[in-house]
Curated annotation (Swiss-Prot):
InterPro entries: UPF0257. A lipid is attached at residue 17 (S-diacylglycerol cysteine). It comes from Salmonella paratyphi C (strain RKS4594). This is UPF0257 lipoprotein YnfC. Pfam families: UPF0257.
Amino acid sequence: MKKPLLLTLLCMILAGCDNPKSLESFTPEMASFSNEFDFDPLRGPVKDFSQTLMSENGEVAKQVTGTLSQEGCFDTLELHDLENNTELALVLDANYYRDAQTLEKKVQLQGKCQLAALPSAGVTWETDDNGFVVSATGKEMKVEYRYDSEGYPLGKTTINSQNTLSVTAKPSADPRKKLDYTAVSRVDDRQVGNVTLSCEYDAYANPVDCRLVIVDESVKPAVSHHYTIKNRIDYY
């Protein structure tokens, strides 16, 4: 076998020589916002994105859209949760996020553009030395967040006066398929649910099309819910 052909095959086996995009870590802002506003984190120079969750009947259950600066700050963020009839639209203004409609100050920021406080709910966020939000403290609860070495969210633990709810995620061993994960939810020591996500990815190792299965184990027999997630991502 000729050496050039051997090198070409080796590149294909190592999965990367034909892909000019380097694998970037998740930024503190992206990882932390995805935790708080419940969307899948993205990496790379994201300019704007939308994530649409659809039921197995093809109905839109939830949609998240956002725009980011070249520095990785969220300029705008919108959430429409049709299943729970809630919505949120934020726009960046100096050290705050304002309500996009009323212009009321909603979220106070720290550092470059990281979450600091939600005054109306009495919630404050704390960050680690790398700028990732590691805890949220309110009047009657505390949430602790975990990440891996690349900044990927590994779950959270919510503690209140009644119980402890923990979510533990285990991502794929393939670093380019972080969103292929399984997660387990527990109330105290009792498992109440599990989630499986599998995706197709773009050149930045971001998910494009995903299949989500949520199993509710709090009822007998357990009930499975199937969804698809469609992502649209534009880059700088």
